[in-house]
Amino acid sequence: MLAQLPRQALSRLSVLPLYGGGFWVAFTQLTVFYYAVGAVLHFVLPRIAPVKPIQHQARKRGEVLRDAFYSLGPLAVKAAIWTIVEHMHSRGLGLTYGGKVYGLAAVSYCSLCVALLDYLHDAWFYWTHRLLHWGPLYRHVHYIHHKYDTTLPPHLPPTRCHLSSRSPSAFTGYSFHLVEAAIVFANEILVCFMFPLHMGLHRCYHLYTTLIHEGGHVGYELAPFIPTLEGLMTLVLRGVRHRAPWLNTVQHHDLHHRYPTRHFSLYFTHWDRLCGTIHPSYDKDLFSYFSSSS
């Protein structure tokens, strides 16, 4: 029966284009990926995998649903930014390129691009994250992401961020203000002017960062680092038993939700260490956690 369908109908049944499909294709990609990954991380893995919680507070009823709902706005902002990148590419603005990627040289270059994107994304996230903790931006914008955290920065009055115990979940990843979304995702446009970047890699990489933001809030560790290319190479070279102190963990960001003036980075710890925003007990607590888990 499927063979009898006209070719046009079959094309409609095909997978969405990776890029070039406009806003609604981008938004569909993001929402399906975000909520599917969130469901697996929040509902499935804790039940089938030997995970050890790092949070000691129960989530209040409705918090997960609230975060899932609040994520829709930032997902739309990210889809709009992807659409801008598509229009830039079609008009020859920036350094993006298309076509097939084959051969050792092309694959090696794409791997180098991933490493560059990791370091640029981490730097952008660290400094914009610190900016979002500046008093006015925190009170009017970033407070949504920390809305029910147990601790507030000492220089801020507990006004709109009313103290109420909670632990973040996977769906907290993109649960933030639309202005924050525009700030956080702006680097996805900026990187298009920094070095030649394949459009397919741009889309896949920034779709993958969605998983990173969700995974940083799940409340348990599955690996001794946030999954990155650098983390994979470290695992190959050092083995699973040797934790790399320069790589971030879920606990790294979880501590930020308990101590909001600490831990602003995403993939790596070097900015926090250089700028004095690493928590004093982080390394010791992390060593104890993984020692007791082994």
Residue ranges, per PLM feature:
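Interfacial transmembrane-helix boundary/kink motif in multi-pass membrane proteins
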Residues: G21, Q55-L75, G98-C110
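Hydrophobic alpha-helical transmembrane segments of multi-pass integral membrane proteins
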Residues: T28-V40, L72-H89, L116, I183-L190
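Conserved hydrophobic/aromatic pocket- or pore-lining residues that grip, position, or stack substrates
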Residues: A68, H129, H142, H146
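Hydrophobic transmembrane-helix microenvironments that flank and shape a buried ionizable site
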Residues: S71, D118-D122, Y126, Y174-H177, ...
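Juxtamembrane helix-loop-helix connectors linking adjacent transmembrane helices
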Residues: A80-H121
